Amino acid sequence: MKAVRLHAFGGPEVLRYEDVPLPRLGPGEVLVRVLAAGVNPPDWYLRDGYTAVPGFNPPVTLPVIVGSDVSGIVAAVADDVRGFTVGDAVFGMIRFPSFGDSAAYAEYVAAPASDLARKPGGLDFVQAAGAPMAGLTAWQYLIALGHDAPNPFQTVPHRPVPLEGRSILINGAAGGVGHLAVQLAKWRGARVTAVASGRHQAFLREIGADDIIDYTATAPETMARDLDLVLDTVGGPSTGRFLRTLKRGGALFPVFLGFQDAQEARERGITVSMAQVRSNGAQLAELGRLLDVGAVCVAIDSTFPLAEAARAHERAASGHLRGKIVLTVG
């Protein structure tokens, strides 16, 4: 089969489209014929050797296939698998945050059955491939964590906060995690302030944002006040600026590493919490039901053939995405 692998770390040019062996099916696994694969930040973190994630240096054996998000058709199931049969349309985030010999940027993937859910009938394969990591990140930050694995970012488990009737600001609201978080927060009854470039204003209104701050015109931390929650999908060292927008007792949820203002957060009475998103087929099935009835939608920024994964990574690096980048397979 064809797959995209790394033989060395570096820029998009190190992504190699090449022949690799078909993955072997292990106990508890499903062989999926991949029709689309989502592109996510951990894909380019892996590609460049995690230089963008200081202090994070997991062991990686090269060559390695890239990617975690897939949608496709079940081609085979292990003898001990129940709930999936050959021909089922499925989607999922595979083995995240761990690694394996089989991954998403490929024509076939051997996936743990517990990582998969049936693809909603109202969703095409491209949209389905764009949903898993972004959707599960938003879900596990805002709705329910869904696992008891140790949190690598803090000593206590992440705990979502009630959303109904609360005011929430989402930074990076037009991006992959952000646009799904806007919709999930609205579904749970929150009032949502969306922060994004002004070019995304109509899109953000369409998906339910109550208020919009164009960060290219106004610093959002000077506009918003007395919020209950900030979900910062951009994160990094600048995420502390949102502390001043929160009321005492509020919460700041950075999605990416780099928060440096723990002392100020304590003085202001603000809870700061992060989560490590993990594969979860059951949660994905719940999200799938919302996608199927149109309560939540997946926006697609752009698509590229699997053979042009390098171009997809170049598009990601250019920034200002609206929704998800997806690779098409076959």
Predicted features along the sequence, with ranges:
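A short acidic, Gly/Pro-enriched loop at the edge of an enzyme's catalytic core
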Residues: 222-229
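Mid-domain Rossmann-like dinucleotide-binding core that forms the NAD(H)/NADP(H) cofactor-binding site
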Residues: 128-214
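Glycine-rich phosphate-binding loop and adjacent beta-alpha segment
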Residues: 233-297, 329-330
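C-terminal hydrophobic helical "lid"/dimerization subdomain
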Residues: 1, 284-330
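Glycine-rich beta-strand-centered segment in the early N-terminal region that forms part
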Residues: 21-39, 51-97
